[in-house]
């Protein structure tokens, strides 16, 4: 198991790098190896000069020939040993180079300590929440320090391991002298290090690729920075092992912040994704440098991270091959045809720290993408002007998006493969059908009558919802899944098809309602025998009261009441900042986005397409329906979360 530096705070990683003697001892060792190499070269030249002088002089015959052969072997021994010493010096300098790079990339411990001291000071004086924005900013900076140190340590480990693989004991070097010529050609000189080391390591990995094991890097979703053992087990059993048998799955830390959804005072989505991408790319290269193949599992936010890392690796100077790297993604916001980030390309909300990145690349590395129908994050309607469909998708972010790990293997095996891809692709797309509309889940929670009423309206409501995806029969877009598809205005569906679907839905709804009503299970009346006894003398005797115990109880009650009031106040005013940020986005970014869409439509019309005028008006309206509905859902989620926290705080003091 390779070390996971990402689980260590910057206080630990920074202290490790900056403590100790630094690179001076390794530089001294490199100089010593250089001196030894120079002495061995001089000895070889001197011995060769002496023996050749004897041969060209008066010493002739068989004895002279035997001496020449023996001398040649010894000269070869000296020369090869000198080459070994030069190689050791080069490796020592390569280690120094790797260390210096890590040192430069690591946050200085004094900066980390100053950050923590500032946070402690602000928290101590944060009586009315006035310091909350400053605390959040410092915590965000601390998260950046964490990611920076983790990436630096991971890179240091990869580089140091590459150097260590080339080192061998002096005795082993001496024993290998008969084949010194080929060995000398493989050793990098001091001028070539550390790139010579990297090339040598990569050559060794390529030669042993057939024997490489596959390591699965499992990342959590938003709010799950460190996946639990159960999470890793389910990710492997349900999604990874089917396509990569024998994978060795292990958790990978990524920040997974999502202000203000996960925690109000939390890392923003953009910062979290950026840090996670650095960590994932470093972990992938670390495993590949160790001779392993890698398969990556990403869920929700970590699917976005995976999408970015795919593109970064493929565009790098030393990209992994498709045989070395693969991906499995679930609940992917960057789904080419359905991901919410792809439906609204390029939109950015600076106040919330959220930016829509591009679609997941489909032809870079072998990838499987699983999406649950009506998951509003990965399966957003193509035609958001359909308010019912958009509202259902927003409900799906709450009721469906978290269901990927409660599915059974049979449900996943029954997933619908989307095979109508365009052009060459390495990605396989799967849709897992959803029986019930998320929009009706609140109605289903009503006792007794909830399910019958939901089943009465669901067939027709599903037709309307599905029209938001383009086909009344499917709750997902049926156009090519590997083509990035932004939102549109109206689906091209015949009114006759819609009418037929509504007629069939009405019949099905009435039938389902009648069946449910005829099979209602009414709650039984309470059994009187279960009522508590009120007979005199029953129950536990009440201990006698004393003045001391009464005062102690009053002190405890006073302290608990004050703490609860403080917690309730903190939770209440903490919701003000995200509410203000949402309002900021709604009042600034959304109008700007509308103007952008309007101008695109006008440009389309000026180029001769009359639909541009329709789009100039319709696209802003469609975007507003989706964005304002999402903003309302987000605000409602924040209020519900705060309400639960307040209720729990109050219930703690109520007997």
Curated annotation (Swiss-Prot):
- PE-PPE domain: which residues? 245-469
Q: Which SUPFAM superfamilies match?
A: alpha/beta-Hydrolases, PE/PPE dimer-like
Origin: domain of life: Bacteria
Gene3D superfamilies, per database record: alpha/beta hydrolase, PPE superfamily
Q: Name one GO biological process term.
A: response to host immune response
Q: Which residues cross the membrane?
A: none
InterPro entries in UniProt: AB_hydrolase_fold, PE-PPE_C, PPE_dom, PPE_sf
Family indicated by similarity: Belongs to the mycobacterial PPE family.
Protein name per its UniProtKB record: Uncharacterized PPE family protein PPE28
């Amino acid at each position: 198991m390779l070390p996971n530096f990402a689980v260590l705070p910057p206080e630990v990683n920074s202290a490790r790098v900056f403590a100790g003697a630094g690179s001076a001892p390794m530089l001294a060792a490199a100089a010593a190896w250089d001196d030894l190499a120079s002495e061995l070269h001089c000895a070889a030249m001197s011995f060769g000069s002496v023996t050749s002088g004897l041969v060209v002089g008066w010493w002739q015959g068989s004895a002279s020939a035997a001496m020449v052969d023996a001398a040649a072997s010894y000269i070869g021994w000296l020369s090869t040993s000198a080459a070994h010493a030069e190689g050791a010096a080069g490796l020592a300098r390569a280690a120094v180079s790797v260390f210096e790079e890590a040192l430069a990339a690591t946050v200085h411990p004094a900066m980390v300590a100053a950050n923590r001291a500032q946070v402690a000071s602000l928290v101590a004086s944060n009586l009315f929440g006035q310091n909350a924005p400053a605390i959040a900013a410092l915590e965000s900076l601390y998260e950046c320090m964490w990611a920076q140190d983790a990436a630096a340590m991971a890179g240091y480990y990869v580089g140091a391991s590459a150097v260590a693989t080339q080192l061998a004991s002096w005795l082993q070097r001496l024993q290998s002298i008969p084949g010194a010529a080929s060995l000398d050609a493989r050793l990098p000189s001091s001028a070539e290090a550390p790139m010579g080391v990297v090339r040598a390591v990569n050559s060794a990995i390529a030669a042993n690729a057939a024997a490489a094991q596959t390591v699965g890097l499992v990342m959590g979703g938003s709010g799950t920075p460190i996946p639990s053992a159960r999470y890793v087990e389910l990710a492997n059993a349900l999604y990874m092992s089917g396509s990569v048998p024998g994978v060795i799955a292990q958790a990978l830390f990524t920040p997974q912040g999502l202000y203000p959804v996960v925690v109000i005072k939390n890392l923003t989505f953009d910062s979290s994704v950026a840090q996670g991408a650095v960590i994932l790319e470093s972990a992938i290269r670390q495993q590949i440098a160790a001779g392993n193949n890698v398969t990556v599992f990403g869920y929700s936010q970590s699917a976005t991270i995976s999408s970015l890392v795919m593109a970064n690796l493929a565009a790098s100077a030393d990209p992994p091959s498709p045989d070395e790297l693969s991906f499995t993604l679930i609940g992917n916001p960057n789904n080419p045809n359905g991901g919410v980030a792809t439906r609204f390309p390029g939109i950015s909300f600076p106040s919330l720290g959220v930016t829509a990145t591009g679609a997941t690349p489909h032809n870079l590395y072998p990838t499987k993408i699983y999406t649950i129908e009506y998951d509003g994050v990965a399966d957003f309607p193509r035609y958001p002007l359909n308010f019912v469909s958009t509202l259902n998708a927003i409900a799906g972010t709450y009721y469906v998006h978290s269901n990927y790990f409660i599915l059974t293997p049979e449900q996943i095996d029954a997933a619908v493969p989307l095979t109508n891809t365009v052009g060459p692709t390495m990605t396989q797309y799967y849709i897992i059908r959803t029986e019930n509309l998320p929009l009706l889940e609140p109605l289903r929670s009503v006792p007794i009558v909830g399910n019958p009423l939901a089943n009465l309206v669901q067939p027709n409501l599903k037709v309307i919802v599905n029209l938001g995806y383009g086909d009344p029969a499917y709750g997902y877009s049926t156009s090519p899944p590997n083509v990035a598809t932004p939102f549109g205005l109206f689906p091209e569906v015949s009114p006759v098809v819609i009418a037929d679907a509504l007629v069939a839905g009405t019949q099905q709804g009435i039938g389902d309602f009648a069946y449910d009503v005829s099979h209602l299970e009414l709650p039984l009346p309470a059994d009187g025998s279960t009522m508590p006894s009120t007979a005199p003398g029953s129950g536990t005797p009440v201990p006698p009261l004393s003045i001391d115990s009464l005062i102690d109880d009053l002190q405890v009650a006073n302290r608990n009441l004050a703490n609860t009031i403080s917690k309730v106040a903190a939770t209440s005013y903490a919701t003000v900042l995200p509410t203000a940020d949402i309002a900021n986005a709604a009042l600034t970014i959304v109008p700007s986005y509308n103007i952008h869409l309007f101008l695109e439509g006008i440009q389309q019309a000026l180029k001769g397409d009359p639909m541009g005028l329709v789009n100039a008006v319709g696209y802003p309206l469609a975007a507003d329906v989706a964005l304002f509905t999402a903003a309302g859902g987000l605000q409602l989620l924040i209020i519900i979360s705060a309400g639960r926290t307040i209720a729990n705080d109050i219930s703690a003091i109520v007997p």
